[in-house]
Amino acid sequence: MNCRRKPLPLHSNEVQAAESISKDELYSWTLKNVLILFLVQYRASTPSALQTSSFSTPVEKKTNGAFSGSLFSAKEKKDNPKYPKDFIKYLSLALESISMGKEPEYQDQLIRGCFAAFYNNINKSHISKQLKDSRKIEDMFLIFASSVSSELTKRLGTAYDSNLADRITASFIELCKRVTLKGQLASPSSEFVSHLDMYHSKLLNKSEILSTKRVNRGQDQFDLSSFPLLKVFSSVFKVAYSKALLDAEKLFPSIDEAAIAEDIGILIEDLESDACKFSHSVVDFSNYKSYSTWKARELQTLEQHRKIMLSLIPLSSSPNHPIQPIGFPASRKTPTYVPPIARPYFRQLLSLCLEYRLQVTDPVEVKQINTFIRECSIYWRILPSTRCALSMDFAREHLQKGLITSADVLTHFGELHKSLKEWEITYWPKIDVSIFSSALFGIRNALAQLLKKSLLDLLHEKKADFHRWLNIMSICVEDGKVINQDLSPKSEISSVALALQEHCKVIFDEEFDLSKLPSSNFLDEIILASNRISVRIKFLERNCSECIYGVLSLPQIFINIVLPNYIRAALVVAKEYLREKANADINDLTKDMLEIYSDLKQMIHVLQEYHNEEYRIGSFEGFFQPFIDSWLDNVEASAEQWFLRSLEKDNFDENSSEGQYSSSIVDLFHAFHQAFRTLEGFEWEDDLANARFFTRFFRVIYIVLSKYTQWTTQKFFEEANKQDDTSEVQNDNSSSWFSKARNILSGSNEVLPFRFSPTMCILLNNIHFAMHAYEELEQKIDLQRLIEALDVAESTKRHKISATNYLYTIKVVRGEGLHPDGAGKIRTSYIVLTDNKGRRIGKTRPIHSMNPRWDDTFEVKTKDALMITANLWSKGKFNDHEIFGRSSFTLSPKIYGDYLPREEWFDLNPHGELLLRIEMEGEREHIGFYVGRTYHDLERAQREMIKFIVNKMEPVINQNLSTATLKKLLSANTWMDLDKTMTSVTSLLNRTGFSSKSSENVKKEGELTDVQIEAAIYELLDYFDLNFSIIAKHLTKDVFVTVMSYVWDEVVCTTEELLLPPVSVKPINRKPLSPAQMAIVYRWLQFLKDYFYANGEGVKLPVLETDHYKELLRVQEYYDKPTDFLLQECDKIASQLYLSSRMVNNEPVESLPRHSRIKFANKEIYRSGTIRKVHIQTNESELERNERIILRILRMRADSKRFLSKHFQRKGRLLMADAMRNGYVMPLGHLKKLDSR
């Protein structure tokens, strides 16, 4: 293929060529194209459509114009709409502009003169007043008709053509419509605009523009005014329609069908011969396939056009243009109606059309413009790709100049996508692809600038719809993929982000720089500025929350620039304020400074949220730390008032609004939570400082709750003493002196039942409520994190045992082998603990027994070693007390430094032994300690109250579950009236609801029935009924279950004492129970378990079936076994336990450093956080339980003394070895004591 033409010029050259085309030349070529379109449509239509049926009738010339009739009669319709209120104002401005020649569409001198005459008339006062009052469009049209008539008479004389006046009036109506729509005075569908269209239509129908203006060519007459594209043509070129019509009438006779067909033939010949003078060549395409595809389509289209034109040629063709036979070469070498190079002409024409389309609002007219563009491109053989590429290029240009809206841009893209479906971009010429690519890049860059403008408006809190530009940008990016171009706007968006950053700096300097805001109160400055910044951030987050293309986040840009600068400026202002107030009290400044801290802290949180990491600004927290300390000082000073005010308002009424607890504890925790929310709101980021703050706060709570528990416990026992005194008075009144004397002489201890008051229950409920409320408060903080922060800070400090306070907990468990009095009677004994200075530490309750079990706990706080003396006192019947035993022991960190609890037997001089359980804990300025001690105090108070309740029940329990009761039950002479017993038992069964075997179910002769066994303890069950009903009514459900579990544990312990002595190395002079006695004891245990369970309505089985209870049930397995069997079993168990211990300690602890071994064994409360986590007790293994049972049974066997001594010596050595493996060396005196045993 030999192409004899160079490739199409570059885009820039094409633009220059288009700009060099004169408007008149373009006007001429375009008018030819319009007339060709008219001729084609005329020939293709039916003869009746556009051609007159008879041409012999002469046109009658009218001397009177349209205004002489009733076209604009004011009486035509009384309810004609009035023109809008500001219509005359906008119309006057348009008329003034036309009169001065500023409007290119109205350059005709006659039109300008007529419009100027009308403009002068309506500015006259009387006419202006008339129009203002009536606002009727008919009045205005009559005034305009008079003005036109006068002006035309003055210029043309009285013989002017009336059609000229009609055309001028039609132009005026069009002007009125344009002014209305452009000024948005009325909608296109309004009644006023409809009336304008109606008058315009009537005027045209009456005028001779449509009826008499004809063009003659041969025997045919043509009406060019009926062609709508001619009107579009006049508007595009901004000439009067009358002028365009006259030019068309002059040019139309030269338009010939044969010449048109010949032009098409020239184009076909040019394409087939590859001359490429008037069409594209192969060099214009990226590959030959694209060119051949285009060429085939183009030839097919041109052949169709030529056939159509030949079919439209009339039989009598023009003599000037004879029909050229098909297949013969054309007589001309250049087309007559097609420009030599059509692309520049079409580009210039498209520019005019698009500019005019921007001014049009009527959709019908917009559609006509699009049709005009398409039809012109068809005959000039402009490809759809060229039309789309140039259209996108003009869209880029108009967008950069701000001439079009987002809707207009979307219209261009819609036309593009429609064209791409018809003509794939693969077959586009290279020049069109280049233009299209440049247009997309330009549109993308323009969109970035428009996006920047919208975002700037958002920074100033102005509404801006930037999403429309983003949507168009996404369309542009997708279209770029069609031409294999990466139009990702990330770099442009990054540039926009940098510009926005600079603008944010300006915003800070102008609006939020506190140093430039003059004010007398710096606090007001900071608070107001903080509020404005918060409002601005919320506005940005609400209107522009997304991150644009992963590059630009408007809120983050604003926050990153403004907030750090603002915080620094605020700190500078705050420091300046503190320098001015250097002599003021810090407490007076605390409130203001904490308000500033809260505002600035909120700003920092916003920064951290957008950075997803900690954001620190210098020593921000360090600057405000003294004011946090001052606030904590105020809290500590107010704590005493919290305590006192809470007690002043509390009446401890059981009918209070709080329910089963009183108002004092509720008020206290309300104050705690209020202060806690303030401290938590500080959100201190420095873990160590935050841990110290919370340590101080929880120390305050510890102090207040410690006082409250002491006061509550004291009031509880005062209330109990009142009840105790009342019971004694009632007993004194009911008992005879003879009964008292008999008890004294017999040595028996009379049991006085105790009645519990509702106030005691409310006090116990308060303590339980405090425990749960404190637990909820503790769970709101990350206690473990605070503990770790304090531990890490103190890890470098050298561990010194003597540098801290220590808390010793001494539990007086029980006594054994106590000596009777001189008469051989059992003593009522108690223990009093004193220190080396004679100060009393504590006193146990008196118990009437040779082997009393006190289980009373006391606490001693000291730094140094302390000698404790335990004095055993005897309480006489006549309040005469005497000491009959004494033992001493030392409390020292050197002995109890492993922080493990120890149970030790101490000899009571001269007779008996005392079992103590001693445990040491550390006390430090540590949040873990205060939290743990608070739990400890609350639980201790609750335990003491519950223990008091159990202790009051204990004598009744011991009196009924005793060897005396067993002996009486098994004696031959029954000690109770059977009828009375049966009546009481039947009543008891009806009350409790648990079933037992009936009295008719009698066992073998001589054996006791279940009814008789139950009847022996009916007084105990009656006592339980009376007191449990009171505490169940006034205690909360959880506390009631706890009390019942304690009572049940007392029942189990009492039953255990009937069966076994405690573990000890020394034998005991005690005989085991007989099989019958043991059976009765276990029947009692089962009866009481059923009583507490109450068919599922009482205490749940998991609470009743404790390990202690299960261990008691296993006593039956070994109780009657021979001594040799028990000795062998004990040795076997000891060996197994030794092997198990070696396996557990396979990894020795001595491999750890010294401080780690101490920490490993440490049982301090603060190391585990809460008293609930201090020491998790594991269930004793079955082997250890069996060993303990066997050792207790062996104490009652006379021939086991030597075995017990050796067994405990061996066990002591094993304990010493374990302690040494754990890195702790026991004191020598302690080891000697173990060996002596």
Curated annotation (Swiss-Prot):
One GO term (biological process):
endocytosis, site selection
What domain of life? Eukaryota
- One Pfam family it belongs to: C2
The C2 domain sits at 786-906
Enumerate the spans annotated as MHD2 domain. Answer: 1014-1130
Q: Which InterPro entries match?
A: C2_dom, C2_domain_sf, Glucose_resp_signaling, MUN_dom, Munc13_1, Munc13_dom-2
Q: Which GO terms describe its cellular component?
A: cell division site; cell tip; cleavage furrow leading edge; cytosol
Q: Name one GO molecular function term.
A: phosphatidylinositol-4,5-bisphosphate binding
Residue ranges constituting the MHD1 domain according to the UniProt record: 591-712
Under what name is this protein listed?
A: Uncharacterized protein C11E3.02c
